[in-house]
């Protein structure tokens, strides 16, 4: 078990594993409507079996080096998470994603957690491209991509059928050289 501090506000990033299914389900239940506005995660975890199954699918992805999932804890309570939806070492490309319950929103938790994931993907694993995809109406998610210094690559028109409506999906990305420059500039300005 490990935890990575996300700052001085008590926020931590930890692996989200199948044995945490009850805690994960309680978290999803607290934020079901909020979480489900733009992503299907709330519908994927409706009882303990489906919550455990969802987390198990990511344990299997991690074992195959094809994805990973982490929870964001704030003062000991699971309030959200981040993940590698896709992790393709052959293509040196991955896709990151996130979710939060309302109590975690507006604190910069996702931006800080995704920064940890991108650092690991680029600096440790040699990923060249990190993608972020979000429904065009999900302004909070799009603002995270902007804060991370990602570039808007384009829009996949009506590519995401969700709750009976086809949504446009915005594609954002950061390339390894760009990420290294951004992180170097942040380090220089912190001195």
Annotate each PLM feature.
Residues 36-56:
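Conserved GNAT-fold acetyl-CoA-binding loop/helix
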Residues 60-65, 150:
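Short loop/turn motifs at secondary-structure junctions and domain boundaries
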């Amino acid at each position: 078990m490990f935890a990575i501090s996300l700052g001085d506000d008590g926020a931590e990033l930890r692996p989200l594993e199948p044995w945490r299914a009850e805690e994960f389900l309680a978290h999803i239940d607290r934020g079901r409507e909020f979480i489900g506005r733009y992503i299907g995660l709330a519908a994927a975890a409706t009882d303990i079996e489906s919550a455990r199954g969802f987390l198990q699918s990511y344990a299997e992805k991690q074992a195959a080096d094809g994805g990973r999932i982490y929870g964001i804890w704030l003062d000991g309570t699971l309030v959200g998470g981040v993940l590698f939806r896709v992790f393709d070492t052959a293509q040196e490309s991955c896709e990151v994603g996130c979710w939060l319950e309302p109590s975690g929103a507006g604190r910069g938790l996702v931006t800080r957690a995704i920064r940890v994931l991108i650092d690991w993907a680029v600096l440790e694993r040699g990923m060249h491209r990190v993608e972020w995809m979000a429904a065009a109406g999900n302004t909070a998610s799009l603002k995270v991509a902007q804060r991370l210094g990602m570039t808007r690559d384009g829009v996949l028109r009506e590519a995401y059928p969700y709750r009976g409506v086809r949504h446009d999906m915005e594609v954002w990305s950061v390339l390894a050289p760009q990420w290294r420059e951004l992180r170097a500039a942040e380090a220089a300005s912190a001195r």
